[in-house]
Amino acid sequence: MNHGLLLTMTEPPAHMEEEFNAWYDEEHLPERLSIPGFRSARRWVADVAPGEGKYLATYELDSPDVLTSPAYLERLNNPTPWSKRCLGACVAFRRWACEQKMPGAAGPHPQAAAVLLALGEMPQEREVREAVQARQFLDPQGAPPWATLYELRAPVPAPAGLRLYRAYPS
């Protein structure tokens, strides 16, 4: 089975920014990485308009089935008081559970300078393909139909018809 990927985009209200980042780094990421099947977790600052989800998190999974495991569901359904406070205050929250389709079982590039999340059809433009290493994911929940996560090596033009989210290490 292919690896899975969980993508989240979150944004706290401005007055909670410091607390939100402390919670994410000190509690949330270690908690998720302690769940069997979570392979890696990285946070990114997204280059988006206010209210669209300032922070992108990428969680690589052994498989998409990790998100239905008893260990994951226990954490998801029993959040800590700090998790309830921080997530409950978010002005933006988006979540995608995906199956990695390309290149299958490859892991994340540990030195990616940035990532680009493209929602929609996979771009065919030559300059995009030359600028990035792409991994494509199918969303089993049906929306968006395809998500492509690019690890950027060079500036990337915005292909027509796609919603693009650029993100940089936090």
Predicted regions and their residues:
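Macromolecular interaction modules
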Residues: 1-170
